[in-house]
């Protein structure tokens, strides 16, 4: 089995996966959402302290399987430095103590494996990545080579939801809160402009939309629940229109045979519905990760670890480092 550890941001998670059939033998996740919600976002120092408390307890839960673990896979890039260190330190110690290989996993590439938790990797593949501070469209060819097609020039899809939620004192994380509030809102009440609508560049930008929302909110002395619902609905509609508007242009050029949406943002049901329409229009096979595994989790890290284990992609424990920022363009997906 492969042991996966994930601690790139504000979730501590551990997973055990069978190398041969990808069966998830054990999975547990400890979220820090309640602790960070009062601050309207993730506080790095608090995240580090909570990881330090949670990870030893998670490892204790899989102690009975130690003799069956063939390698430990851990997220070592990208993410919050203080959070990455917590997971990598634990993984390094386990590798040395158990005498098993250590595997470093790129967190964003890990999300790609969330599409294939219980099956073999399918290539070629187009990907919409909407995870935390990242919004990207990727093309992965038959060899696993990853090409970046589009990214954001400022705020990400997820960050814009978090910031709009904070503007209305709704709590953190903003994605699920805005989506739920939007259900009872009127998406046509506020006519927010879709960013870069007539710009031919394959690029995303959410800061302008965020500022449109802030300007609208400033016009109110106080916001009623209905006002908040209408703002949430109008904002969500415009943000997703921005995603799909650029995707239509990308699909026209790339003709994806398979397409997957990954990351916490891909759990949004309105976005999923829009992606279904696009993929039906262009004849692309659409894939999603199970809702439980859209957000950060160790199952996807273990799944990536299985592929890297089979390809003998190991790192010496004392040589493993963390990388808070990294590029996906030119990276490879193992299968």
Swiss-Prot record:
One of its GO terms (molecular function) is N(6)-L-threonylcarbamoyladenine synthase activity. One of its GO terms (cellular component) is cytoplasm. Fe cation binds at residues 107, 111, 296. Pfam families: TsaD. Disulfide bonds: none annotated. Keywords: Acyltransferase, Cytoplasm, Iron, Metal-binding, Transferase, tRNA processing. Its EC number is 2.3.1.234. Required for the formation of a threonylcarbamoyl group on adenosine at position 37 (t(6)A37) in tRNAs that read codons beginning with adenine. Is involved in the transfer of the threonylcarbamoyl moiety of threonylcarbamoyl-AMP (TC-AMP) to the N6 group of A37, together with TsaE and TsaB. TsaD likely plays a direct catalytic role in this reaction. PANTHER family: TRNA N6-ADENOSINE THREONYLCARBAMOYLTRANSFERASE, TRNA N6-ADENOSINE THREONYLCARBAMOYLTRANSFERASE, MITOCHONDRIAL. This is tRNA N6-adenosine threonylcarbamoyltransferase.
